[in-house]
Amino acid sequence: MESTFHSDTLDSFPNYQENSLNTNEEQTNPLESLRDGWASSNSSSSSSLLLPDENEGNEVFGSLKGLVTQSKFGQWANKLSKSLQARRRKSESISKPRVYYSVFMAPSWVLHAEKHWEEYPHYAGYDYKDYVRLLDATKEAIAHGVFPVLISKGSSGSYFVKNKVQKNIAVFKPKDEEPYGKLNPKWTKWFHRNLFPCFFGRSCLIPNTSYLSEAAACVLDRGLGLYLVPYTSVASISSPTFNYDYFARKAFLTRNKPLPEKTGSFQQFLDGFVVASKFFAQHPWPGTRHRETREYTESVASSEDFDIFDPFLAENEIETEFWTEELRLKFRFEFEKLVLLDYLMRNTDRNLDNWMIKICYEPCDNEEYYKSINLLSTNLTPNMSANSVDPAISQTSDFWKGPHFQIGAIDNSLAFPYKHPDSWRSFPYGWLSLPRSLFTQPFTEFTRQLFLHKLTSREWWEKLSDDLRNVFNQDLDFDEKMFSRQLSLVKGQAYNIVEVLKNPLMNIYDLLELPNLYVVEDVVRIEVNEPTSANSEEAEFGLPIKRDYGSILHPSCSQTFPPYPGSQLLQATPGRSFSSNAEALLPLNYITLLSKDSSSPKMLKDVIFERLQCASSNAVFSTC
């Protein structure tokens, strides 16, 4: 490994400076070189991480390197380096088998729909090209002396990023300034960590991954086609206004040494949006008593403060000058997207101050809005027929020509837990403090069709899993087992969503009343036909090549596979029945379900069988 240390650290060795100038034509960043040394598979010893390479004639460096290498510290560093390299190579080269049996079953009216909606109607959102443009504008502004500004609210080091004209364009959250990061500039969490260790952190979340959770929320949002989360990605920025340790700050001030770049989440700034608490204070939802004097930012209120409405009688809601019937329907259309997104990624920190609302008074020219109008049932009684999924487009409707809403889901740093929260601190969703009538209406047909189509697609889940893994894999402490647990929880939440959306009369309250689940993947080796071509899935499994995730059936089975051992089914879930008898069917007995064509050559193949697992509801005293 070539030398990556600064010359000022070795002022007493002039020969090294001269030799390094002759051997290294291109100088590299010392921090990047050190990080690459820990992760590079070409590094063979820890001494290359601790000392630069010396010439054969340099006796001083030879003796120093020998002492370090032979010492216990050098041996420990060598083992640590190799273990980190092996774990990184293992996580990068992982190849999972494909899912052969899934718990997600799509209804027939979704499988046979002529039109599958891929995304919600939305306005032009930021993409990767816009993110690169904003990042370049940020670095250019910092070079001209326009530095990010610390946000006073919140418990972590978050910064408003500005361009050269002092306009907010993004929000940056460094990793080491997270709520419990070592360089958090706010003292609240320092007191929590040092004086109240019993109430430190959230045991259901992986520590120091909040910045990755922000980026993963954007990946999930784009995968579902919601466009609620502002475009977010991981970036590296350095600025004097960031919180650095004493040595980095002193080197910058005294020796003019550049400040090291900080890695964190870089999120687009939402212009023209208002936080939900202020919006509902200005425009109270109709049907709430004492709405002139009561704030919506309080905790979940009792039912006495709200009028209880019949979920199918919209006329019980009082129509105001602002909240007309059409405007209420438009807001529900956007609000249920936020509910499903938070539920799917199990956001543990959603309140009325970290999601935003914008009213657009300009006429909507988006053709997708006109296409979706007939999918919004104005009488709030959905229809499950296939014709309702692909309705006739009425271009004459002026439903979307008036004011409409946009919702921004910001601050998703405390999402994607690896286990469900303990029952003694469950982290309820903050939007539950809104009036009851927002939650008692059934989901719109557009939402039901789009979510069922995506959440029961094997290809969609495979792509989402790869995209989420690429996000969380950016951290040097990435653990594949912990990521699998995170994905298992997301799939458990998705299973509840699928089961609720199958019923056209279920609403948000019905979704939140379901038990917490995990979807566990069991790798099973089965006997299949030997493939004869590149696209030979039909010949290999005896199944059609083009099939949906929830419709994986074998010709020898009449409707579906027998119950999988160990699966736990909810008695309240209609149309499903699981067996808890482990002897009912052994995993390898699935081999008998394959094609009985003995003339075809056979081969063994690893596949995945999914099963449900209920989360423990017992309260366990642990850090929160």
Curated annotation (Swiss-Prot):
Enzyme type, top EC level: transferase
EC number(s) from the headed UniProt entry: 2.7.1.67
Gene Ontology process terms (BP): endosome organization; Golgi organization; phosphatidylinositol phosphate biosynthetic process
GO molecular function: 1-phosphatidylinositol 4-kinase activity; ATP binding; metal ion binding
Region (Activation loop): 409-429
Cofactor names: Mg(2+); Mn(2+)
Chain spans, region Catalytic loop: 346-354
Span of domain PI3K/PI4K catalytic: 145-520
A family per Pfam: PI3_PI4_kinase
Function comment: May play a role in endocytic and/or exocytic pathways.
Protein name as annotated: Phosphatidylinositol 4-kinase lsb6
Record organism: Schizosaccharomyces pombe (strain 972 / ATCC 24843)
